[in-house]
Amino acid sequence: MLENEGYGSTFGDPANDPYLARTLVRRGALLENYYGVGHNSLDNYIAMISGQPPNPSTQGDCTSGFDAFPSSSRSTTWRGATGVQQGTGCVYPARVGTLVGQLAAHGFTWKAYMQDMGNDPHRDGAPDSACGHPSVNGPDPAINAVAGDGYVTRHDPFVYFHSIIDNAANCRSHVVPLGTTSGTMPKSDTIGATGLAQDLRSVATTPNFSFISPNVCQDGHDYPCANQRTPGSSALADIEGFLKVWVPRITSSPAFKADGLLEITFDEGSGSTSCCGEVPGPTNSAPGGGGGPGGGRVGAVLLSPFIRPGEVVTRAFNHYSTLASIEDLFGLPRLADAQTVRGTFDRGVFRTG
């Protein structure tokens, strides 16, 4: 997931980011009308892995504290979607479903790779480099980047679910540092966690589902960057640098060549435009913070051996569509607001023969 760029400044103006908007688009499928679901960052990340709509806390990135939902809050059926969490909070009750919980229950593997997690274990809340998060109902010290550490909690949606963090050992084995391209992990690692480069070496070690969060410099969020060792010329240049390093490693891996799919998108753009019949959740009348309920048009590119290179898809999608598409591909039931979308990545995107 990348940060804070609307379609017009990226895919709509390839001179700004030629590797993403020209090279990768020519190799895959451009989703021209792909939208965020709110502002600021966190609610978009949460939506993509759980289908939960924005609430006032997640809309504000939970910067005031890593607060749990009140014990009195309940899940409800909301405008056609079941399992939507009521109330305001940051850390969702254990009963709230997630994509990775579904995957694990059906025998699939998953991993979330967080760049810079564990660089400063005390700050990140990751004593052994992995599963970094604040104490529940405590302050979040990892809101902004510091020298040498650009991990921020709000770009790691997995730690906002009790179903993940309450099993510390399981969380530490699944929510891990990205590592370097040579496979080196932070010095704080004491559990033998493996990063993306090492996991990509074989089909057997590559998770069925992976989620990658660059640090807040390389995802384009910050410019200039407190954690940046070699300054780039712009936020988009920093994004390009990250993609040029990691996309070839992913697409040349045995698992990707066999049957992989890589999605590259942004959390939110400018404005509050939306698609796909998105409606506000039960506790937030304006998740877009403006005249509409969404997070603006951001676009996305999909890469896969099963995609016709240079495909341009004009149908509308959003982060709930991504979740619904992944659930459909794995034969899983749809969670929360993923139940409300009609458009998914289907035969209109993939070639089947």
Spans of features found by a protein language model:
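N-terminal pro-sequences and low-complexity stem/linker regions of secreted or lumenal proteins
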Residues: M1-G353
